[in-house]
């Protein structure tokens, strides 16, 4: 089957644009086009994003209410009395992730009622925050009862068991990501102020000569980078790097602390922890031009893609560690392939693309997006997989919710942001990464460009791209030729197509074949 990529005659593909003179904060050399600038018009993703807004986010908040997650904030903040109501000390994080998803969703589907609910919820979170900025409802509630009810995973003193399982810093990482998303969506600083107060405490408590416990479950690194971008305060960036650099060399492989991060060559341990850490390292590599980090994550990416990834793009072969096994040990029936790990691997591959501009990273991203991630949520958007095995006897069914609800809340925050993976820019270079029908507005080298796609992907391989610049000029359009259109199932030779199609794609510009 031929995959036709046709460019309409609205424009000549090269357009001369002035170099952007605006000074930008050092960051990724390639920048994603924000999801708010890309309106999907397809019949595949657009309905799913709407379903996420209309079904997933409301039911996720409903379960947070009924399970006691929201009530924990009310008790910690003095609005109610009682003991900690939920199972895990990281249950706060689900609320933060759903706030993040709701904030993204508001920018596509404005909803005054939802925004008002967020205002009230954030007010409750603020009440639960202690005067010095500490926010961890399990401890705050336990201290109201003389320490009774403190989770066994938490130490009597703050932070000291975070390397193990307390998840104090994990919760905060998701708080910071939610706070930046909410501020960008609404312009309100209510949650951002809570996040800054918290991060200032973490910065005060952690560092050389202070607490040197590394995060047991990575994510705060990405959250701190987002906070740095939002505020310009470099201490948050420095703290993110500190948390990465204090890992290893004598820690557990389970949470990637068996070596210093710059010495690691293999993907090991818990796959969600791992991909969140690699994504945080990519952020630091981009902002600080850190070659040691870049070399490490490049080696690790190769280890994953050449021997530890499923044909669906899923990662994590074993349930015991919810993570990676030895190379080529990829059982189908017992495959773990956690939904959160698929989302984490999408984060990781997208960041590597933004560093290098190599389509192979989008090949992995696309494979995971349409398969191992997407299987994690039902078409009705109200039932979820935690693991996604490749073989089933029929007993493995999606669930409405989980006691450990990291996957539904992750889906709720990831799906609204999918349009942000379609395009990227670097000055006058525009990258078309995913083929999804859309209408987009792109700032290309300081000039506005309208770009649209008409496609029925993944059902059909024919794509028509139209470009309409605000004024005549020159730019470079990079069209990704997917690996599967070049007879490559995934980068490397782990998987091969049984049928090789030599004539697999055609590029036509203004009616002229330019292959």
Model regions and ranges:
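Bacterial N-terminal signal peptides that target proteins for export
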Residues: 1-9
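C-terminal motif of bacterial Sec signal peptides marking the signal peptidase cleavage site
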Residues: 16-19
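Glycan-recognition and catalytic cores of secretory/periplasmic carbohydrate-active enzymes
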Residues: 23-515
